[in-house]
From Swiss-Prot:
Keywords for this protein: Glycoprotein, Host Golgi apparatus, Host membrane, Membrane, Transmembrane, Transmembrane helix, Viral envelope protein, Viral matrix protein, Virion
Species of origin: Avian infectious bronchitis virus (strain KB8523) (IBV)
Membrane topology label: Multi-pass membrane protein
Membrane topology, Intravirion segments: 42-51, 99-225
Pfam families: CoV_M (PF01635)
Superkingdom of the organism of origin: Viruses
Primary localization: virion
Role according to the record: Component of the viral envelope that plays a central role in virus morphogenesis and assembly via its interactions with other viral proteins.
Side Virion surface, residues: 1-20, 73-77
GO cellular component: host cell Golgi membrane; membrane; viral envelope; virion membrane
Protein name listed in UniProt: Membrane protein
C-alpha cells in the first residue's frame, strides 16, 4: 500500500469548501472592489492609503508564494516556471525600492514610495510651507488652483494658502530628473470680493536638470522673485 496521501480536492469537496468560506470570499472581493474603484488621491484619501498598503503587500506576497512554489514544484516544468517568476518578482521589487529611494533623495517626500506613480510634484510656498503630491507622469503644463483659501493641484488637496503665496517656479521630480515649471499666467479674481475665494495659476515646463529640491529651498529668495 502506498504511504502517499492524495491531497487533490474533487468537485464536491471544492463546493463544500466554497460554501464554508463564501462569506469571507464575498467580503474580501468587496474590499478589493472598493479599494480599486474608489482608491484615488483625488477622492477619498483614507481608501487611497489602504490601496497603497495593499499594493505594497502584493510584492512580498508574490515572492513568498513563488518561493513556496520553488520548494514544492508540481513537476520539472513547474519548477522552471516558478524560478523564473520568482526571480522576476524579486527583481521588480528591488527595482521599485531603488527608484523610490532615488526619488526620495531628490524630493524628500514620502510620496516617492507611491507604487502607482513615477513622479512627485512640489510647490514651495513663499510662507515656507512645502506641498508635495503624487503625479503619474511629467506633464507639459500644471494648473494649481486656490478655492476658498485651499490649494489644489492635479485634483489633490494640498494646503491652505493665499494667492500671493504661490511661487514663481514649481517642480516635478522623477528618479533621475528635476523638471522646472515657470508661472506664465494667473487669475486671482476681480475686485468684487472673489480674490480670496478663487484663483487659477498656469505653469509651463521650462527646463530640466538633475538638481534636488533641497538645493532650491536653501538657495535664497531668488526662488520667489
Amino acid at each position: 500500500m502506498s504511504n502517499e496521501t492524495n491531497c487533490t480536492l474533487d468537485f464536491e469537496q471544492s463546493v463544500e469548501l466554497f460554501k464554508e468560506y463564501n462569506l469571507f470570499i464575498t467580503a474580501f472581493l468587496l474590499f478589493l472592489t472598493i479599494i480599486l474603484q474608489y482608491g484615488y488621491a483625488t477622492r477619498i484619501r483614507f481608501i487611497y492609503i489602504l490601496k497603497m498598503i495593499v499594493l505594497w503587500c502584493f510584492w512580498p506576497l508574490n515572492i513568498a508564494v513563488g518561493v513556496i512554489s520553488c520548494i514544492y514544484p508540481p513537476n520539472t516544468g513547474g519548477l522552471v516556471a516558478a524560478i523564473i517568476l520568482t526571480v522576476f518578482a524579486c527583481l521588480s521589487f528591488v527595482g521599485y525600492w531603488i527608484q523610490s529611494c532615488r526619488l526620495f533623495k531628490r524630493c524628500r517626500s514620502w510620496w516617492s514610495f507611491n507604487p502607482e506613480s513615477n513622479a512627485v510634484g512640489s510647490i514651495l510656498l513663499t510662507n515656507g510651507q512645502q506641498c508635495n503630491f503624487a503625479i503619474e507622469s511629467v506633464p507639459m503644463v500644471l494648473a494649481p488652483i486656490i478655492k476658498n483659501g485651499v490649494l489644489y493641484c492635479e485634483g489633490q488637496w494640498l494646503a491652505k494658502c493665499e494667492p500671493d503665496h504661490l511661487p514663481k517656479d514649481i517642480f516635478v521630480c522623477t528618479a533621475d530628473r528635476r523638471n522646472i515649471y515657470r508661472m506664465v499666467q494667473k487669475y486671482t479674481g476681480d475686485q468684487s470680493g472673489n480674490k480670496k475665494r478663487f484663483a487659477t495659476f498656469v505653469y509651463a515646463k521650462q527646463s530640466v536638470d538633475t538638481g534636488e529640491l533641497e538645493s532650491v529651498a536653501t538657495g535664497g529668495s531668488s526662488l520667489y522673485t
